């Protein structure tokens, strides 16, 4: 699929430990990676066509930046997967207009959110 003008195309997460971060996201969400050596890993798109982001171990992890929010068909299963993979829940699931969501910190301290809609999609 061709990129869309001005659409968000790629999200890069700064991480403190590339191997630990790859293991966390693979275990919690089933993400796959393209390895570019010890200094970078690309996050493979869900359909396997290209990349949607990357993990950068050379950047500083800064709290309070933009919040990346993932979608889940089963929010409670996602909470359990994050905990099982070693993530920390920083905001327990809560309701908001149209759905529910929670926030977690990955092993590097990046905060992300996960949401689900009232209808599941």
What do the predicted segments below correspond to?
Residues 10, 21, 40-43, 52, ...:
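Residue-level detection of beta-strand scaffold positions
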Residues 1-4, 8-16, 59-121:
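Vicinal oxygen chelate
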Residues 30-36, 88-93:
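Short secondary-structure junctions
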Residues 1-22, 49-50, 66-68, 118-121:
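N-terminal beta-strand motif that seeds the catalytic metal site of vicinal oxygen chelate
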């Amino acid at each position: 699929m061709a990129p869309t003008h001005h659409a968000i195309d790629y999200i890069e997460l700064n991480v403190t430990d590339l191997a630990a971060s790859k293991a966390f996201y693979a275990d919690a969400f089933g993400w796959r990676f393209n390895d570019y050596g010890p200094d970078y890993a690309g996050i493979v798109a869900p359909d396997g066509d290209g990349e949607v982001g990357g993990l950068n171990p050379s950047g500083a992890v800064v709290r309070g930046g933009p919040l990346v929010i993932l979608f889940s068909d089963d929010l409670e299963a996602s909470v359990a997967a994050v905990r099982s993979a070693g993530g920390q829940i920083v905001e327990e699931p809560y309701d908001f207009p149209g759905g529910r969501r929670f926030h977690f910190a990955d092993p590097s301290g990046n905060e992300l959110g996960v949401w689900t809609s009232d209808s599941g999609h």
